[in-house]
Amino acid sequence: EPSLASDVVTCVTGAMVPQLEAFRDMLLAEGVSHWRLFSIFPMGRAKHDPTLRITDEQFRTLMEFIRRTRREGRIDASYACEGFLGGYEAEVRDHFYECAAGVTVASIRVDGAISGCTSIRANFHQGNIYRDRFWEVWEHRFKPFRDREWMRTGACADCRMFRYCQGGGMHLRDDDGSLLYCHYKRL
């Protein structure tokens, strides 16, 4: 329907990388005009199943594929809203990277937990709508989301790109706040 905005989301696995062009062509044949591609981060099932994740080389291949597809202009393809991508930033998505979780976006889970994003671990929840007023939580909590200096540890401690990525996506932090992996360094 013309008035309904939609897109196709694809979680790219290692097995999917060699099939990207054929998959794109199938989407085009079906009339799809917007396509978002995600890489799978190592949590949940993907933590213990390497077939769900892509290697660094496959990640670069994915970025090159998206860049090439965008230049062709037949489908509006873009990379997910996660991870700073250095020189690929303006080439694989329409906006410069930012993790908007808890900054301009909040999520309420089925159990009432208030978080910046449903992809973020429970220990980053900031309240619960069944016991807290949402506006109070929004106005007075979310400090770990809005002040990212606590992320300047490990791989981020001396990184010259920190001012751009601010420590990456909150969903890429494990339970103790350590970075699971850095998109920029994968490239």
Could you say what each language-model-derived stretch is?
Residues 1-115, 120-125:
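Radical SAM enzyme [4Fe-4S]-AdoMet core and its adjacent flexible, acidic
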Residues 119-187:
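Flexible mid-to-C-terminal extensions adjoining Fe-S/redox cofactors in radical SAM and related proteins
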